[in-house]
Amino acid sequence: MATYALSQAHREQMEKSLVDSDPEIAQIMEKEIQRQRESILLIASENVTSRAVFDALGSPMSNKYSEGYPGARYYGGNQHIDAIELTCQARALKAFNLDPEKWGVNVQCLSGSPANLEVYQALMRPHDRLMGLDLPHGGHLSHGYQTPSRKISAVSTYFETFPYRVNTETGIIDYDTLEANAELYRPKCLVAGTSAYCRLIDYGRMRKIADKVGAYLIVDMAHISGLVAAGVIPSPFEYADVVTTTTHKSLRGPRGAMIFFRKGVRSTDPKTGKEIMYDLEGPINFSVFPGHQGGPHNHTITALAVALKQAATPEFRQYQEQVLKNAKALEVEFKALGHKLVSDGTDSHMVLLDLRPKGLDGARVEAVLEQINIACNKNSIPGDKSALTPCGIRIGTPAMTSRGMSEEDFKRVARYIDQVINLCKSIQADLPKEANKLKDFKAKVASGSVPEILALRKEVAEWASTYPLPV
């Protein structure tokens, strides 16, 4: 019989539950679970994942170290880790209907921004050029954001970046100006991806522009990958050289990321007729490990494999169809209530509300919504002067659709937001001139002295609690 070299107290420490071992942390976690259960969750980059994904995420798979790739690890004992990673890769390709002869995938990326940096480093040398959608116009930090006076994203310090933008009248990407600028700038990489753009991207036009200037087309589908997997919006894979995505947004998996890359023939030399092959797999995999990361998070890869299996089901497609219906319901109701939407609506999982006609900023509206248990976020919109007090709010449907909300429910959500916008205006108007800054506004709405907020908080919490939350 084996002996136990350490004390009984040590053994108990290793085997105690969280509640028994660390009640302080357990209580904070319970409060967060209660917040989620009693809140209308509208942050477009969030979702509510399944219990099966949680089971895999909080598992002994996190015990194992496995630097390297399946069949080529720097540690022993990885036979089951290899099996999980290979299964995850196969499921990723299946979820997006990809031919493994033409596409490969890296599932070790820790998150979306690192995944994008890993791609850039694989395809470019320092100070090579990249073009991405400007952040205030719906892009993402990791696409090389900088201001006239400061480089914000590290991407813009390693590489030269130049933004493209939307037409401020229509809110749609200005492809003509993008093409003209790309011809002058000659980027090595053209990034097609967004974080707050509600319309479909014309990937075909992007491909033509990339080909015209000899650039790689990188699609960052982090927000919409679940919709793409379900086939309810057009896929970028027909046009892209590389596709990146996070795994925890509309895909409804654990927090992580994937990089998909082309394999096989890239083009044919017009002079010699010789096939020019893609050389992406080796450089991208090397950029992930050992270039930027060490050991992968095996518990995350395990949970991602579970989520990808779910993403290939009819139930997941039905869910994504409802995500789109619910976003369209928000559009219809907000317009009926007299609100302005950036790009005049949505083709995706979110809407972007323009608060300028109401004389408000997103920071104030977000603050009051949070007080009544509605979670969404302030967001920059085209023409904004400040990222701290932008004039938009972003409202997404994935999380509450996962909990079972319908179109009529989201119309009710729009009416709550309309109430809050009107309430914001009256609260701001009542503040004294010497104390009417954002910090004063936030202090007022958090003070418990606004009866409308207290009544709405109770009403929303009771309503939200009727929808299930897998924990």
Swiss-Prot record:
Record has Kinase as a keyword: no
Catalytic activity: (6R)-5,10-methylene-5,6,7,8-tetrahydrofolate + glycine + H2O = (6S)-5,6,7,8-tetrahydrofolate + L-serine
Named cofactor requirement(s): pyridoxal 5'-phosphate
Protein name (database record): Serine hydroxymethyltransferase, cytosolic
PANTHER family: SERINE HYDROXYMETHYLTRANSFERASE (PTHR11680), SERINE HYDROXYMETHYLTRANSFERASE, MITOCHONDRIAL (PTHR11680:SF28)
Family of this protein: Belongs to the SHMT family.
A Pfam family this chain is assigned to: SHMT
Pathway assignment: One-carbon metabolism; tetrahydrofolate interconversion
Protein origin, superkingdom: Eukaryota
Enzyme Commission number(s): 2.1.2.1
Coiled-coil residue spans: none
A single MF term (Gene Ontology): glycine hydroxymethyltransferase activity
Protein role: Catalyzes the interconversion of serine and glycine. Essential for viability and required for virulence in a murine model of established pulmonary infection.
SUPFAM superfamilies named in the record: PLP-dependent transferases (SSF53383)
GO BP of this protein: glycine biosynthetic process from serine; tetrahydrofolate interconversion; tetrahydrofolate metabolic process
